[in-house]
């Protein structure tokens, strides 16, 4: 394969894995530990 093809596949996989990890952090089990600044400062 050409170098550009390997590089583009690597970048695509990297972006896909980062997106999956951020979605897991936002909506998965670790989201219970996230704080909500709007709930901390109710008027």
Curated annotation (Swiss-Prot):
**Could you tell me the superkingdom of the organism this chain comes from?**
Eukaryota
GO CC, one annotated term: chloroplast thylakoid membrane
- Membrane topology type, per the record? Single-pass membrane protein
Provide the protein's localization: Plastid, Chloroplast thylakoid membrane
Q: What does this protein do?
A: May play a role in photosystem I and II biogenesis.
Recorded family membership: Belongs to the PsbN family.
What is this protein called in UniProt?
Protein PsbN
**What gene does this protein come from?**
psbN
């Amino acid at each position: 394969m050409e170098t550009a093809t390997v590089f583009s596949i690597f970048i695509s996989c990297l972006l896909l894995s980062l997106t999956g990890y951020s979605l897991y952090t936002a909506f998965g089990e670790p989201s219970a530990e996230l704080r909500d600044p709007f709930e901390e400062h109710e008027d």
